[in-house]
Protein backbone atom coordinates (compact mmCIF):
# COMPACT_ATOMS: atom_id res chain seq x y z
CA UNK A 1 0.00 0.00 0.00
CA UNK A 2 1.68 3.27 -1.09
CA UNK A 3 1.80 6.48 0.91
CA UNK A 4 -0.75 8.38 -1.14
CA UNK A 5 -3.25 5.54 -0.96
CA UNK A 6 -2.93 5.28 2.82
CA UNK A 7 -3.43 9.03 3.27
CA UNK A 8 -6.47 9.07 1.01
CA UNK A 9 -7.92 6.05 2.75
CA UNK A 10 -7.49 7.59 6.19
CA UNK A 11 -9.11 10.85 5.08
CA UNK A 12 -12.01 8.94 3.56
CA UNK A 13 -12.69 6.99 6.77
CA UNK A 14 -13.10 10.25 8.65
CA UNK A 15 -9.53 10.89 9.70
CA UNK A 16 -9.05 8.57 12.64
CA UNK A 17 -5.62 10.16 12.93
CA UNK A 18 -4.99 13.86 13.45
CA UNK A 19 -2.66 15.58 10.96
CA UNK A 20 0.19 15.57 13.48
CA UNK A 21 -0.20 11.84 14.21
CA UNK A 22 -0.35 11.05 10.52
CA UNK A 23 2.92 12.92 10.05
CA UNK A 24 4.38 10.96 12.94
CA UNK A 25 3.39 7.71 11.22
CA UNK A 26 4.96 8.80 7.95
CA UNK A 27 8.20 9.72 9.73
CA UNK A 28 8.29 6.47 11.71
CA UNK A 29 7.70 4.31 8.64
CA UNK A 30 7.91 5.96 5.18
CA UNK A 31 6.34 2.87 3.61
CA UNK A 32 3.31 3.39 5.89
CA UNK A 33 2.93 -0.33 6.49
CA UNK A 34 0.11 -1.66 8.63
CA UNK A 35 2.30 -3.54 11.09
CA UNK A 36 1.02 -3.54 14.65
CA UNK A 37 4.12 -1.99 16.30
CA UNK A 38 4.04 1.02 13.97
CA UNK A 39 0.30 1.56 14.36
CA UNK A 40 0.54 1.26 18.12
CA UNK A 41 3.30 3.84 18.13
CA UNK A 42 1.21 6.45 16.34
CA UNK A 43 -2.16 5.69 17.94
CA UNK A 44 -0.64 5.04 21.39
CA UNK A 45 -3.25 2.37 21.97
CA UNK A 46 -3.43 -1.30 20.96
CA UNK A 47 -7.21 -1.32 20.51
CA UNK A 48 -7.17 1.87 18.42
CA UNK A 49 -4.35 0.44 16.31
CA UNK A 50 -6.36 -2.71 15.59
CA UNK A 51 -9.48 -0.67 14.75
CA UNK A 52 -7.53 1.59 12.40
CA UNK A 53 -5.91 -1.33 10.59
CA UNK A 54 -9.30 -3.02 10.18
CA UNK A 55 -10.96 0.14 8.77
CA UNK A 56 -8.11 0.77 6.33
CA UNK A 57 -8.13 -2.81 5.06
CA UNK A 58 -11.91 -2.73 4.59
CA UNK A 59 -11.97 0.55 2.71
CA UNK A 60 -8.80 0.24 0.63
CA UNK A 61 -10.32 -2.00 -2.11
CA UNK A 62 -13.03 0.65 -2.64
CA UNK A 63 -10.52 3.46 -3.13
CA UNK A 64 -10.19 3.31 -6.98
CA UNK A 65 -13.97 3.56 -7.38
CA UNK A 66 -14.18 6.46 -4.93
CA UNK A 67 -11.38 8.37 -6.67
CA UNK A 68 -13.02 7.80 -10.06
CA UNK A 69 -16.25 9.29 -8.69
CA UNK A 70 -14.34 12.31 -7.41
CA UNK A 71 -12.73 12.85 -10.81
CA UNK A 72 -16.16 12.76 -12.46
CA UNK A 73 -17.15 15.62 -10.13
CA UNK A 74 -14.06 17.60 -11.13
CA UNK A 75 -12.36 16.97 -7.79
CA UNK A 76 -8.61 16.39 -7.66
CA UNK A 77 -7.00 14.61 -4.72
CA UNK A 78 -3.53 15.82 -3.77
CA UNK A 79 -1.64 13.78 -1.15
CA UNK A 80 1.24 15.51 0.58
CA UNK A 81 3.70 13.34 -1.36
CA UNK A 82 2.50 14.90 -4.65
CA UNK A 83 4.52 17.52 -6.52
CA UNK A 84 1.26 19.44 -6.88
CA UNK A 85 1.03 19.94 -3.12
CA UNK A 86 1.52 23.67 -2.32
CA UNK A 87 5.09 24.56 -1.35
CA UNK A 88 4.17 26.96 1.44
CA UNK A 89 1.52 24.75 3.03
CA UNK A 90 3.90 21.82 3.17
CA UNK A 91 6.23 23.84 5.38
CA UNK A 92 3.84 24.20 8.36
CA UNK A 93 3.91 22.02 11.46
CA UNK A 94 0.70 20.12 10.71
CA UNK A 95 -0.07 20.21 6.97
CA UNK A 96 -3.14 18.28 5.78
CA UNK A 97 -2.27 14.76 4.64
CA UNK A 98 -4.48 15.26 1.59
CA UNK A 99 -6.01 18.25 -0.16
CA UNK A 100 -9.18 18.00 -2.20
CA UNK A 101 -9.18 20.61 -4.95
CA UNK A 102 -11.71 21.87 -7.46
CA UNK A 103 -10.70 24.39 -10.09
CA UNK A 104 -7.52 25.78 -11.63
CA UNK A 105 -4.73 23.61 -10.23
CA UNK A 106 -2.03 25.96 -11.54
CA UNK A 107 -2.95 28.44 -8.79
CA UNK A 108 -1.37 26.11 -6.23
CA UNK A 109 2.08 26.66 -7.69
CA UNK A 110 2.04 30.06 -9.37
CA UNK A 111 1.76 33.54 -7.93
CA UNK A 112 2.64 34.84 -4.49
CA UNK A 113 -0.20 34.49 -2.00
CA UNK A 114 -1.62 36.65 0.78
CA UNK A 115 -4.49 35.77 3.11
CA UNK A 116 -7.31 38.17 3.97
CA UNK A 117 -9.64 37.42 6.89
CA UNK A 118 -12.02 39.34 9.12
CA UNK A 119 -15.44 39.67 10.67
CA UNK A 120 -18.61 38.17 9.24
CA UNK A 121 -20.32 41.52 9.88
CA UNK A 122 -18.18 44.20 8.26
CA UNK A 123 -19.02 47.88 8.38
CA UNK A 124 -19.03 50.13 5.33
CA UNK A 125 -15.43 51.01 6.23
CA UNK A 126 -14.44 47.33 6.25
CA UNK A 127 -15.99 46.79 2.83
CA UNK A 128 -14.18 49.83 1.46
CA UNK A 129 -10.86 48.60 2.86
CA UNK A 130 -11.25 45.12 1.34
CA UNK A 131 -12.06 46.50 -2.10
CA UNK A 132 -9.19 48.99 -1.96
CA UNK A 133 -6.50 46.58 -0.72
CA UNK A 134 -7.60 43.70 -2.93
CA UNK A 135 -7.51 45.83 -6.06
CA UNK A 136 -3.94 46.96 -5.29
CA UNK A 137 -2.77 43.46 -4.38
CA UNK A 138 -4.27 41.85 -7.48
CA UNK A 139 -2.69 44.52 -9.67
CA UNK A 140 0.70 43.19 -8.52
CA UNK A 141 -0.29 39.67 -9.55
CA UNK A 142 -0.69 38.25 -6.05
CA UNK A 143 -3.28 35.56 -5.31
CA UNK A 144 -5.83 36.26 -2.56
CA UNK A 145 -6.50 33.41 -0.10
CA UNK A 146 -9.50 33.35 2.21
CA UNK A 147 -12.12 31.10 3.78
CA UNK A 148 -15.30 31.72 1.74
CA UNK A 149 -17.11 32.70 4.96
CA UNK A 150 -19.71 35.45 5.22
CA UNK A 151 -18.42 38.99 5.43
CA UNK A 152 -14.77 39.88 4.84
CA UNK A 153 -13.80 36.42 3.50
CA UNK A 154 -16.44 36.26 0.80
CA UNK A 155 -15.92 39.92 -0.05
CA UNK A 156 -12.19 39.32 -0.52
CA UNK A 157 -12.88 36.59 -3.08
CA UNK A 158 -15.50 38.69 -4.87
CA UNK A 159 -13.23 41.76 -4.92
CA UNK A 160 -10.41 39.65 -6.39
CA UNK A 161 -12.66 38.46 -9.17
CA UNK A 162 -13.89 42.01 -9.84
CA UNK A 163 -10.28 43.20 -10.02
CA UNK A 164 -9.54 40.43 -12.55
CA UNK A 165 -7.19 38.82 -10.05
CA UNK A 166 -6.94 35.22 -8.85
CA UNK A 167 -8.24 33.77 -5.61
CA UNK A 168 -8.17 30.58 -3.53
CA UNK A 169 -11.05 29.60 -1.24
CA UNK A 170 -10.45 27.20 1.64
CA UNK A 171 -13.68 25.66 2.91
CA UNK A 172 -14.34 24.03 6.28
CA UNK A 173 -16.31 21.01 5.06
CA UNK A 174 -16.50 19.03 1.83
CA UNK A 175 -17.52 20.27 -1.62
CA UNK A 176 -20.99 18.77 -1.30
CA UNK A 177 -21.70 20.98 1.71
CA UNK A 178 -20.64 24.53 0.85
CA UNK A 179 -21.12 26.84 3.84
CA UNK A 180 -22.56 29.42 4.10
CA UNK A 181 -25.17 28.79 1.43
CA UNK A 182 -25.24 32.50 0.61
CA UNK A 183 -21.82 32.04 -1.00
CA UNK A 184 -22.82 29.03 -3.09
CA UNK A 185 -22.91 31.00 -6.35
CA UNK A 186 -19.51 32.51 -5.55
CA UNK A 187 -18.14 29.05 -4.76
CA UNK A 188 -19.44 27.68 -8.08
CA UNK A 189 -17.73 30.49 -9.97
CA UNK A 190 -14.46 29.95 -8.11
CA UNK A 191 -14.55 26.20 -8.74
CA UNK A 192 -14.73 26.94 -12.48
CA UNK A 193 -12.34 29.86 -12.81
CA UNK A 194 -10.20 29.93 -9.65
CA UNK A 195 -9.85 27.14 -7.07
CA UNK A 196 -11.49 25.75 -3.94
CA UNK A 197 -9.61 23.62 -1.41
CA UNK A 198 -10.59 21.39 1.50
CA UNK A 199 -8.79 18.85 3.63
CA UNK A 200 -12.03 16.90 3.98
CA UNK A 201 -13.64 14.44 1.55
CA UNK A 202 -16.50 15.95 -0.53
CA UNK A 203 -19.29 14.36 1.52
CA UNK A 204 -18.06 15.82 4.84
CA UNK A 205 -20.47 18.19 6.57
CA UNK A 206 -18.70 21.15 8.22
CA UNK A 207 -18.41 20.85 11.99
CA UNK A 208 -17.57 23.54 14.53
CA UNK A 209 -13.99 22.33 14.98
CA UNK A 210 -13.36 22.28 11.22
CA UNK A 211 -13.22 26.09 11.06
CA UNK A 212 -10.05 26.64 13.14
CA UNK A 213 -8.54 23.68 11.24
CA UNK A 214 -9.40 25.48 8.01
CA UNK A 215 -7.77 28.68 9.25
CA UNK A 216 -4.31 27.08 9.50
CA UNK A 217 -4.56 26.23 5.79
CA UNK A 218 -5.40 29.83 4.87
CA UNK A 219 -2.34 31.10 6.70
CA UNK A 220 -0.23 28.12 5.63
CA UNK A 221 -0.81 28.83 1.94
CA UNK A 222 0.09 32.49 2.38
CA UNK A 223 3.24 34.53 2.92
CA UNK A 224 1.25 36.77 5.25
CA UNK A 225 -2.25 37.36 6.58
CA UNK A 226 -4.22 40.62 6.64
CA UNK A 227 -6.88 41.06 9.33
CA UNK A 228 -9.64 43.50 8.34
CA UNK A 229 -12.01 44.13 11.25
CA UNK A 230 -12.91 41.68 14.00
CA UNK A 231 -13.71 41.77 17.68
CA UNK A 232 -11.04 40.89 20.23
CA UNK A 233 -12.22 37.27 20.34
CA UNK A 234 -12.91 37.00 16.63
CA UNK A 235 -12.08 33.80 14.76
CA UNK A 236 -9.92 35.88 12.44
CA UNK A 237 -7.47 36.34 15.32
CA UNK A 238 -7.10 32.56 15.46
CA UNK A 239 -5.89 32.71 11.87
CA UNK A 240 -3.50 35.53 12.78
CA UNK A 241 -2.01 33.60 15.70
CA UNK A 242 -1.67 30.49 13.55
CA UNK A 243 0.12 32.60 10.95
CA UNK A 244 2.59 33.76 13.60
CA UNK A 245 3.20 30.17 14.70
CA UNK A 246 3.89 29.28 11.07
CA UNK A 247 6.41 32.08 10.69
CA UNK A 248 4.17 34.23 8.50
CA UNK A 249 3.78 37.99 8.64
CA UNK A 250 0.61 39.41 10.18
CA UNK A 251 -0.89 42.70 9.02
CA UNK A 252 -3.78 44.55 10.64
CA UNK A 253 -5.96 47.38 9.37
CA UNK A 254 -6.47 50.08 12.04
CA UNK A 255 -9.99 51.26 12.75
CA UNK A 256 -11.90 53.63 14.98
CA UNK A 257 -11.42 53.35 18.75
CA UNK A 258 -15.20 53.46 19.04
CA UNK A 259 -15.77 50.54 16.66
CA UNK A 260 -15.94 47.13 18.42
CA UNK A 261 -14.81 45.49 15.17
CA UNK A 262 -11.55 47.43 15.42
CA UNK A 263 -10.71 45.64 18.68
CA UNK A 264 -9.10 42.62 17.01
CA UNK A 265 -6.75 44.55 14.70
CA UNK A 266 -5.81 46.97 17.51
CA UNK A 267 -4.94 44.03 19.77
CA UNK A 268 -2.78 42.49 17.04
CA UNK A 269 -0.97 45.78 16.45
CA UNK A 270 -0.27 46.04 20.18
CA UNK A 271 1.22 42.55 19.99
CA UNK A 272 3.51 43.40 17.10
CA UNK A 273 1.45 43.04 13.91
CA UNK A 274 2.22 45.61 11.22
CA UNK A 275 -0.42 48.30 10.82
CA UNK A 276 -1.13 48.89 7.14
CA UNK A 277 -2.70 51.78 5.25
CA UNK A 278 -2.11 50.52 1.72
CA UNK A 279 -0.90 47.47 -0.17
CA UNK A 280 2.52 49.12 -0.47
CA UNK A 281 3.02 48.51 3.25
CA UNK A 282 2.61 44.78 2.55
CA UNK A 283 4.94 44.74 -0.44
CA UNK A 284 7.65 46.52 1.57
CA UNK A 285 7.39 43.91 4.33
CA UNK A 286 7.33 40.96 1.90
CA UNK A 287 10.02 41.64 -0.71
CA UNK A 288 11.06 39.05 -3.25
CA UNK A 289 12.90 36.26 -1.48
CA UNK A 290 13.87 32.63 -1.76
CA UNK A 291 12.22 30.83 1.14
CA UNK A 292 14.00 27.79 2.55
CA UNK A 293 12.10 25.14 4.46
CA UNK A 294 12.60 21.64 5.75
CA UNK A 295 10.37 18.93 4.35
CA UNK A 296 8.27 17.26 7.08
CA UNK A 297 9.03 13.84 5.59
From Swiss-Prot:
InterPro entries given in the database record: DprA
Gene3D superfamilies linked to this entry: 3.40.50.450
Induction record: Expression activated by ComK.
This protein's UniProt keywords: Competence, Cytoplasm, DNA-binding
GO molecular function: DNA/DNA annealing activity
Pfam families in the record: DNA_processg_A
Iron recorded as keyword: no
GO cellular component, one term: cytoplasm
GO BP: establishment of competence for transformation
First-listed, main subcellular location of the protein, grouped into a coarse class: cytoplasm
Coiled coil regions in record: none
Location(s), subcellular: Cytoplasm
Effect of disrupting the coding gene: Transformation efficiency drops 50- to 100-fold.
Subunit composition and interactions: Interacts with RecA. Interacts with ComFA and ComFC.
Entry's family note: Belongs to the DprA/Smf family.
Purpose: Protein that helps load RecA onto ssDNA during transformation. Binds cooperatively to circular ssDNA, is able to bridge different segments of DNA. Favors the loading of RecA onto SsbA- or SsbB-coated ssDNA and formation of RecA-DNA filaments. RecA-ATP cannot catalyze homologous DNA strand exchange; SsbA and DprA activate strand exchange by RecA-ATP.
Name of the protein this chain belongs to: DNA processing protein DprA
